[in-house]
From Swiss-Prot:
Designated name of the protein: Large ribosomal subunit protein bL32
Positions of disulphide bridges: none
InterPro entries: Ribosomal_bL32, Ribosomal_bL32_bact, Ribosomal_zn-bd
Any one annotated GO CC term: cytosolic large ribosomal subunit
Alphabetized SUPFAM superfamilies for the sequence: Zn-binding ribosomal proteins (SSF57829)
HAMAP family attached to this UniProt entry: Ribosomal_bL32
Source species of the chain: Mycoplasma genitalium (strain ATCC 33530 / DSM 19775 / NCTC 10195 / G37) (Mycoplasmoides genitalium)
A family per Pfam: Ribosomal_L32p
Amino acid sequence: MAVQQRRSSKHRRDKRRSHDALTLQTLSVCKKCGKKKLSHRVCSCGMYGELRVKKAH
């Protein structure tokens, strides 16, 4: 197991952790059925923007 040679400063530690923040997924609303969906995904009603992509269940 590795053993550190010198103690890392708070600044160096925080710079390393600067990219670790979590972000929430953004939701958009379907223009046809009004349900919430993930952006750039086909809605459960079968619409992707203005295009009908698949048949609804």
